[in-house]
């Protein structure tokens, strides 16, 4: 019985220790060297909103014709005394970048096709070329302490997905892409 108890304590320590390393406070989110605030029309200007952890942005292996990026973001809700940590991964289809679609359209115009330019906009709205996945990374109080409350998966996804062209949720994956590769996704040929 004593062994089970000690094993349980050890296991609990292994599970909580990694979560404490990811915890952030409201004050830390305001450090512009580590976090970048993602402007949103929903922000009140009182420290709420989404923050990208610049140190977490990294490219990961992707199939041919794609690029993938992982990062951590934090959604701050000061009035609720809550910060929601999220681990996100975006997949970018290189043949769906705006520059690629414009180049393909220009080539078809040179070959006599009379498709109007608005078709590029419509094609991009149908499929932005960016798909994302979101995982809950933990919930924290504004002071950085771990909070046991969890946000529902539907709410997590609604905060940043889907990345539709022309929509506010399109900013985050584009910011991540620019941080990882030094060029905007839609400027890729």
PLM region descriptions:
Residues 22-87, 91-189:
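N-terminal secretory-pathway/extracellular module detecting exported/lumenal segments
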Residues 1-23:
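Classical Sec-dependent N-terminal signal peptides that target proteins to the secretory pathway
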């Amino acid at each position: 019985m004593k062994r089970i108890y000690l094993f349980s304590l050890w296991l609990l320590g292994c599970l909580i220790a990694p979560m404490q390393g990811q915890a952030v406070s409201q004050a830390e989110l305001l450090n512009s060297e580590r976090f970048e605030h993602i402007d949103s029309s929903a922000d009140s200007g009182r420290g709420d909103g989404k923050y990208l952890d610049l140190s977490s942005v990294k490219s990961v292996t992707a199939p041919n014709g794609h690029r993938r990026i992982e990062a951590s973001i934090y959604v701050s809700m000061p009035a609720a005394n809550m910060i929601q940590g999220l681990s996100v991964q975006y997949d970018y289809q290189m043949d769906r970048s705006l520059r690629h679609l414009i180049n393909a359209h220009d080539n078809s115009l040179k070959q006599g096709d009379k498709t109007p330019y608005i078709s590029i906009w419509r094609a991009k709205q149908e499929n932005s070329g960016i798909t994302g996945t979101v995982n809950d990374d933990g919930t924290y109080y504004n002071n950085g302490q771990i909070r046991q409350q969890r946000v529902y998966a539907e709410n997590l996804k609604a905060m940043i997905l889907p990345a539709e062209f022309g929509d506010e949720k399109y900013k985050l994956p584009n910011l991540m892409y620019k941080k990882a590769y030094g060029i905007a996704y839609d400027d890729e040929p």
